[in-house]
Regions:
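TOPRIM fold recognition
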Residues: 18-19, 23-24, 31-93
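Glycine-rich, flexible N-terminal cofactor/catalytic loop recognition
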Residues: 1-23
Length: 93
């Protein structure tokens, strides 16, 4: 079974689906991650691998830390900040 990927927002889901059309994501909708989202992540982790894939900035790090504290057992995937800036000078991956 494929993992569930935790991302920050819709744009992240859209970008991942350009590469992996069937990928399942949980969107945190920013760094103010709510209890409903935590519950979704906890439920997903009961039956699937969960990978947190957030931006390498302060909000992304904050989200990773909150999830790690509240949902032990998730895995993390992220790019170092220096490698995250696109070549065409946009800030987002």
């Amino acid at each position: 079974m494929n993992p569930v990927i935790v991302v920050e927002g819709r744009d992240d889901t859209r970008r991942l689906r350009e590469i992996y059309p069937d990928i399942e994501t949980i969107e945190t909708n920013g760094s103010a991650i709510d209890e409903e989202t935590i519950a979704l992540i906890q439920k997903a982790l009961q039956t699937r691998e969960v990978i947190v894939f957030t931006d390498p900035d302060y909000p992304g790090t904050r989200i990773r830390n909150i999830i790690q504290d509240r949902v032990p057992g998730v895995k993390h995937a992220f790019i170092e900040r220096e490698e995250a800036v696109r070549k065409d000078n946009h800030k987002s991956l």
